[in-house]
Swiss-Prot record:
Catalyzes the thiamine diphosphate-dependent decarboxylation of 2-oxoglutarate and the subsequent addition of the resulting succinic semialdehyde-thiamine pyrophosphate anion to isochorismate to yield 2-succinyl-5-enolpyruvyl-6-hydroxy-3-cyclohexene-1-carboxylate (SEPHCHC). It comes from Bacteroides fragilis (strain ATCC 25285 / DSM 2151 / CCUG 4856 / JCM 11019 / LMG 10263 / NCTC 9343 / Onslow / VPI 2553 / EN-2). Gene3D superfamilies: 3.40.50.970, TPP-binding domain (3.40.50.1220). Homodimer. This is 2-succinyl-5-enolpyruvyl-6-hydroxy-3-cyclohexene-1-carboxylate synthase. Binds 1 thiamine pyrophosphate per subunit. Keywords: Magnesium, Manganese, Menaquinone biosynthesis, Metal-binding, Thiamine pyrophosphate, Transferase. One of its GO terms (molecular function) is thiamine pyrophosphate binding.
Length: 555
């Protein structure tokens, strides 16, 4: 029988799955549940060493002899610090060593309780990875614990070998051994390239070919990659391809971009029918909350993430099984002719549903202003989308392939969008258009204080007197008082600041003015000065128009 502590069961199951089966056990009470579970499992070879200073070096010897990782487990407090010399040796000798420390619950650290000190991160730069496991009480705790353990154990041999530290808080009662077996756990595997000399990837290709419902999601990518026709033809028919404007030209063929609206329009039965079996992602952040929610609630059987750095990105909460550390385009071209030569129906099902969705034809609003700009953009320009409403509403409209799209989606904050766009435009010869909301603009208005902008800069400022996006958040009902603070209501205009900084200023109050101003704003020839078009709308009306459009999608 094993410990009833779920984080310990996850730990032991994943040590076994990742091939860490030689373990040095040090005495103690707080680590007794871990020791009992490890020692009681037939797949582990355990060694008892009393002195932690010696135990750490003993574990290094075990790892060196066979070339496979070894682990050392100690109790809480200064017992952990006694492993420090061995960890330093493992780090500089590049030995795969797992340090497992039992710990008191976080609430009891620095409270004069016995054998307590701040253990998470105690080895700092001398370990390749340090994780502090949660105690598991919810499904999210279990997912988080599993992910942290996979992250740590994968790092043992990632870009060279070295030690990792796993800290395990254990609450009392400590000695309840009621689990009859280890749980089935999700194991994440990393392929460092698809190289037969590095790892046999035949099994990976077999798994790829066994699925019929395959989805490819491309996140933000600040580049253009043109696939050769021979690759495009093979890849495009095999997957349902999804990307947003931020993905730019990085997809073989024509991707589905209105998937966020499609998911809203689908009935629950249709959503069930369209669940993918395999999702492969590459690129950066995905804007659509609806897609992320859909795949978290309806997880695929597998999620593979392809990236040059090999990071563990478990975006769909527990679906990640495989990390492929290589250039995503190299990966695509590698698998193109390893796929079974068939034409699955799944991609066409998505395409047929999405092409039937009505295009937005909206009355005067901040959404229609964005649409007017996108439809009139000159070829080969750059479009900078600020965060919050701007980047989301732009997704409602089709965008020419020749337009390069930029956005600060690393952290998705409203600060700095204007400064980033102006910096980009300063080093660019093409026309640069910026779409930005009022809060983001005024928060970053000192971007115009800099003198590094020219006539290739044109800013569409959407001013509806506050944070309109907060009006559309489901479940948020605001009183008059909270409304003022949450949405940051204001009556500010950019006119004086724009004119003082040398911009041509255009004020728009209705649809007729918008049509007229847009002609000047989007003309491909350079003007004598940069332009700010400030479009004033009513935030309550904007929210109502947006809701009406989504209601239309349902019918």
């Amino acid at each position: 029988m094993y410990s009833d502590k779920k984080n310990i069961l996850q730990l032991v199951a994943l040590l076994r799955a990742h091939g860490v089966t030689k373990v040095v056990l040090c005495p103690g009470s707080r680590n007794a549940p871990i020791v009992h579970t490890l020692a009681g499992h037939p797949d582990f070879t355990c060694y008892s060493v009393t002195d932690e200073r010696s135990a750490g070096f003993f574990a290094i010897g075990l790892a060196l002899q066979g070339g496979t990782p070894a682990a050392v487990c100690c109790t809480s407090g200064t017992a952990l610090l006694n492993l420090h010399p061995a960890i330093a040796e493992a780090y500089y000798q590049k030995v795969s060593l797992v340090v497992i420390s039992a710990d008191r619950p976080a609430a009891w650290i620095n409270q004069m309780d016995g054998q307590t000190l701040p253990q998470p991160g105690v080895f700092r730069s001398l370990v390749k990875k340090s994780v502090d496991l949660p105690e598991i009480h919810t499904d999210e705790d279990e997912w988080y614990c599993n992910r942290l353990l996979n992250e740590a154990l994968l790092e043992l041999n990632h870009h060279g070998k070295g030690p990792v530290h796993i800290n395990v808080p254990v609450s009392e009662p400590l000695f309840q051994f009621t689990a009859e077996s280890l749980p089935e756990v999700r194991v994440i595997t990393r392929y460092q390239g698809l190289n037969v000399y590095d790892r046999d990837y035949d099994g990976l290709i077999d798994r790829l070919n066994k699925y019929n419902r395959r989805m490819m999601i491309v996140g933000q990518m600040n580049l253009i990659y043109l696939f050769e026709k021979k690759y495009s033809k093979m890849l495009y028919k095999q997957f349902a391809w999804f990307t947003e404007h931020l993905g730019n030209q990085t997809v073989p063929g024509i991707p589905i971009r209105n998937f966020d609206a499609a998911l809203y329009a689908m009935s629950p039965e249709m959503q069930e029918k369209m669940i993918p079996e395999l999702v492969i992602t590459y690129g950066g952040h995905i804007v659509s909350k609806r897609m992320k929610k859909y795949l978290r609630q309806h997880p695929p059987k597998e999620h593979w993430h392809v990236s040059p750095d090999g990071e563990v990105i478990d975006l769909f909460q527990g679906a990640l099984t495989t990390i492929i550390e290589m250039d995503p385009f190299e990966f695509m071209e590698k698998i193109a002719f390893l796929l079974d030569n068939r034409t699955p129906e799944y991609p066409r099902q998505w395409e047929n549903f999405c092409k039937e969705l009505p295009r937005p034809e909206l009355p005067y609003s901040e959404m229609s202003a964005i649409g007017s700009l996108i439809q009139a953009l000159p070829a080969s320009c750059a479009l900078h989308l600020a965060n919050s409403s701007a980047v989301r509403y732009a997704q409602l409209y089709s965008l020419p392939d020749t337009v390069e799209v930029c956005c600060n989606r690393g952290t998705s904050g409203i600060e700095g969008s204007l400064s980033t766009a102006i910096g980009y435009a300063a080093a660019s010869k093409k026309l640069n258009f910026v779409v930005i909301g009022d809060l983001s603009f005024f928060y970053d208005m000192n971007a115009l204080w800099n003198n590094h902008f020219g006539s290739n800069l044109r800013i569409l400022l959407l001013n509806n007197g506050g944070g309109e996006i907060f009006h559309t958040l489901p479940g948020l009902e605001m009183s008059g008082t909270s409304h003022r603070f949450v949405t940051a209501v204001h009556k500010t205009s950019a006119k004086g600041w724009a004119e003082e900084r040398g911009f041509l200023y255009q004020e728009v109050q209705d649809e007729k003015q918008l049509d007229e101003a847009m002609k000047t704003f989007t003309q491909p020839e350079l003007l004598t000065q940069p332009v700010i078009m400030e479009v004033f709308t009513n935030k309550n009306k904007d929210a109502r128009i947006l809701k009406d459009y989504y209601h239309q999608l349902k019918n």
